[in-house]
């Protein structure tokens, strides 16, 4: 079995109380088995972790934590070496820049929103021409605006929602 020891033996006895985590000191063979499994799969399933834990005589939650810590260490190493992390997008590409919307663009969009909370593609393209913003950003602006103003006046409720909200008969 792996040895469990206090996180820091140099702490006074009262600081090493029952709330302190124990660290896992694994044998070389346990470390080799953990590392071999990690090299095959950075995110093994619960069944794999349970099987590994049983095979090397370490509690499964400790195996889970070992994998989390190992992934964290690997990610830090990749960042230091500025290599892309497997499965992540290219760090040079990153996210799309945030679109800055001016006061006049906002005013125009608000007027359009008051007229129609669900503009069609033609109306959005016209707004795009008027504001100079891409149509896709106009669409997202309307989605966000509707989400912020949920429950306020908008489209008339559908027959289904009227039936669902009606008082019980009887």
Swiss-Prot record:
Keywords: Activator, DNA-binding, Homeobox, Nucleus, Repeat, Transcription, Transcription regulation
Broad class of the protein's primary localization: nucleus
Record's GO cellular component terms: nucleus
Tissue-by-tissue expression: Expressed in rhabdomyosarcoma TE671 cells as well as in several other normal and cancer cells.
Region annotated Disordered, chain positions: 75-100
GO molecular function, one term: DNA-binding transcription factor activity, RNA polymerase II-specific
Gene Ontology biological process terms in this record: positive regulation of transcription by RNA polymerase II; regulation of transcription by RNA polymerase II
Domain of life of the source: Eukaryota
Location(s), subcellular: Nucleus
UniProt DNA-binding region: 19-78, 94-153
Family matches, as InterPro entries: HD, Homeobox_CS, Homeobox_regulator, Homeodomain-like_sf, HTH_motif
Family, per entry: Belongs to the paired homeobox family.
Domain commentary: Homeobox domain 2 confers nuclear targeting.
Function: Probable transcription activator. Binds the P5 DNA element sequence 5'-GATCTGAGTCTAATTGAGAATTACTGTAC-3'.
Further details from the record: DUX genes are present in 3.3-kilobase elements, a tandem repeat family scattered in the genome found on the short arms of all acrocentric chromosomes as well as on several other chromosomes.
Annotated protein name in UniProt: Double homeobox protein 1
Species annotation: Homo sapiens (Human)
Name of the gene: DUX1
